[in-house]
Amino acid sequence: MKLVTFEADGTVKHGRLSDGTIEELGDGDLAAIVAGASADGAAVATHAEADVTILAPLLNPPKVLCVAANYQEHITEGGGDPVDKKRIAPKMFIKPHTALCGPGDVFEIPEISAAADWEVELCAVIGREARGVSADEALSYVFGYTTSNDISLRKLAMGYERDIVGNVAFFDWLEGKWADNSAPIGPYLVTADEIGDPQTLPIQLWVNGELKQDLTTANMIFTVAELVAFCSRLCTLVPGDVILTGTPSGVGATTGTYLNDGDEMIAEVGPCGRLVTPVRGTSSPAD
């Protein structure tokens, strides 16, 4: 089942999507459905998808969790060595709520950045409270999946000279994940039963029509199940939490090609829909 949050007549609503028609189920986003309310009820109205504005499936998720370096190809393109997953743990971080946005929302390059980059990712949405679950049972806690783009600022221009020593470079990387609208998700939330195995999905991203990233989720180092299980050991996962599961190779940093005013990104993961993000703003000089 494909579910959407949308705006019609100035009101946020949610519903089922099929063949370009939305069967409206009620007001608000999909949070109640994700938490256990039925999505099988009778429609209160119908809308043509083209006549409404599709929003992020969840407008205020409790947590936006992300993993770094979860595809060997992405590690290799950045100059890293092959990894043995038995000897490492997932590298998790959190994005602020202000990073989250939906399809068609503009990403404005902040003045502090000279190098805004793209990262298409599969996003898993938690549907049940999970604490200390095993990888074998972890997928039963996932409500569904959507497309995401972990837009990242590779360089920060602080406006003064700095010594890049110690852990400064790490914190620059971390803070480069915080920009407003740098975590678009959508357009559809596809229920887990329809996806089946999340490790079989094509994952792609285009910039201005040029294919930049093209791989499959089978190439993840840590599977979705392993990531959910690991995160549930760190903290309690609750319905509506979203987990961005890492990006494949093909990011702009590899060639020094970054986003500019007027660019358009299109991210797509299997049946989760094409997530369009227009880019505005002019980058400032880097340190």
Mark where each language-model region is.
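A generic local secondary-structure boundary/capping motif
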Residues: 54-56, 80-83, 107-116, 130-137, ...
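N-terminal non-catalytic cap/leader segment that marks the start of a structured domain
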Residues: 1-91, 204, 264-268, 283-287
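Short loop segments at secondary-structure junctions
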Residues: 20, 97-98, 127-131, 151, ...
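Non-heme Fe(II) oxygenase catalytic core, chiefly the N-lobe of the double-stranded beta-helix
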Residues: 102-154
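A gly/proline- and charged-residue-enriched helix-loop-helix capping module
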Residues: 86-104
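Short beta-strand-to-turn element immediately C-terminal to the catalytic PLP-Schiff-base lysine
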Residues: 6, 15-18, 94, 103, ...
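Catalytic-pocket segment enriched in acidic/His residues
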Residues: 44-47, 53, 57, 74, ...
